[in-house]
């Protein structure tokens, strides 16, 4: 029985055929992890996966990775190693000579007889791209997102299950923080951020998926505020944005998928006029969020979802204070396609996962953002977050 990674590699090869490319060249990062299950950080050492349109994939890697690469669940994967005292470009040049077509009629050759095209990882360092050009001077180059984006943008059942678990963990943390109510008064943003990350781990999450945001009072007007030493005060609105990675249940491979949730709460009682204003702005954002989720369905465009949220906020007079797109795709990366922005005509399809996170940011005063992850289903949207979206805090919140 083929592993999930073998099926993904075959799908990649079919797409290489579709775009008339000879091969894809990938470096450590989400694309390589998606196709092989191998997870490693980029470094100055040459580690490249070559996926030819026709034939078996080949990985060129430092010898130090031999054991990890040979246990990957891909029977057809050829492993070519180099030692630190070797010139890795000699091995890369030899592999490219084997994989690239020598002329018209060879497997993988361009249909129109032009030079073969190599699709390079969008995250490949410029120095590595220059090395590939030197090793294959007759080739033309384009970006691997031409084939990998279309593969990764629709999540399979295993990926969706990991994303659901990440959402459930975020929900549990959200409820726990809300339940503490005025106990949060006097704590710094950084202290609360650390507590959120501790709870994410306690409830089964892995590493934080991104820097946890605790933005209290006027700091909430900065969408990507760095949690600092400001002490939370009674009556403060607080923007909380957090999530943790969860491992997908892939046989003999890895793949981490993130949670990503934002809630805005008020701790204790604010003065009446201020609280009324907080509540009005929060309700506008909440209605924008509802409108965007209701706009999600197969065949709708990503731009239509953005416009659904944006029109609510503009009609309420806060259009200039909604300073970012409505959402972003989520998968092996916290930010990936599809991007939920007004001019994106990409049609939504079942299995796509993205955030819906409208916000209003009033500089020097406060901010409000509400974010859930949603999955496009056959007839609409499934929310991956179900924790309360209102202002309320305290032990009675459900």
What does each model-identified segment do?
Residues 1-398:
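Active-site neighborhoods and metal-handling regions in enzymes and metal-associated proteins
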């Amino acid at each position: 029985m083929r592993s999930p990674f073998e099926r993904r590699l075959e799908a990649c090869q079919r797409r290489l055929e579709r775009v008339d490319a000879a091969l894809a060249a990938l470096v450590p990062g989400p694309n390589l992890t998606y196709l092989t299950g191998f997870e490693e950080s980029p470094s100055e050492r040459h580690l490249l996966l070559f996926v030819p349109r026709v034939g078996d994939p080949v990985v060129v890697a430092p010898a130090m990775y031999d054991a990890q690469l040979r246990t990957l669940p891909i029977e057809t994967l050829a492993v070519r190693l180099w030692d630190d005292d070797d010139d890795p470009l000699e091995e890369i040049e030899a592999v490219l000579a084997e994989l690239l077509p020598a002329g018209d009629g060879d497997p993988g050759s361009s249909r129109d007889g032009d030079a073969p095209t190599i699709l390079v990882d969008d995250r490949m360092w410029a120095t590595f791209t220059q090395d590939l050009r030197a090793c294959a001077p007759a080739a033309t180059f384009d970006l691997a997102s031409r084939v990998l984006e279309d593969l990764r943008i629709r999540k399979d059942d295993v990926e969706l299950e990991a994303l659901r678990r990440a959402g459930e963990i975020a929900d549990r943390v959200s409820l726990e923080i809300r339940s503490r109510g005025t106990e949060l008064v006097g704590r710094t943003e950084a202290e609360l951020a650390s507590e959120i990350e501790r709870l994410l781990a306690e409830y089964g999450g892995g590493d934080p998926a991104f820097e946890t945001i605790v933005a209290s009072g006027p700091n909430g007007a900065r969408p990507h505020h760095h949690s600092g030493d400001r002490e939370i005060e009674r009556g403060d609105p607080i923007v909380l944005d957090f999530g943790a990675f969860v491992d997908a249940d892939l046989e003999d491979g890895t793949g981490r998928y993130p949670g990503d949730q934002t809630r805005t709460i008020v701790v204790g009682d604010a003065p009446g006029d201020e609280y009324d204003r907080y509540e009005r702005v929060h309700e506008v954002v909440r209605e924008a969020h509802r409108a965007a989720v209701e706009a999600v369905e197969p065949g709708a465009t990503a731009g239509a979802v953005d416009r659904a949220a944006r029109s609510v906020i503009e009609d309420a007079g806060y259009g200039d204070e909604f300073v970012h797109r409505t959402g972003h795709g989520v998968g092996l990366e916290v930010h990936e396609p599809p991007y939920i922005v007004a001019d994106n005509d990409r049609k939504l399809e079942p299995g796509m996962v993205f955030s819906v996170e409208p916000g209003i940011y009033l500089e020097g005063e406060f901010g409000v953002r509400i974010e859930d992850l949603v999955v496009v289903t056959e007839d609409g949207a499934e929310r991956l977050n179900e924790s309360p979206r209102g202002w309320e805090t305290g032990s009675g919140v459900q």
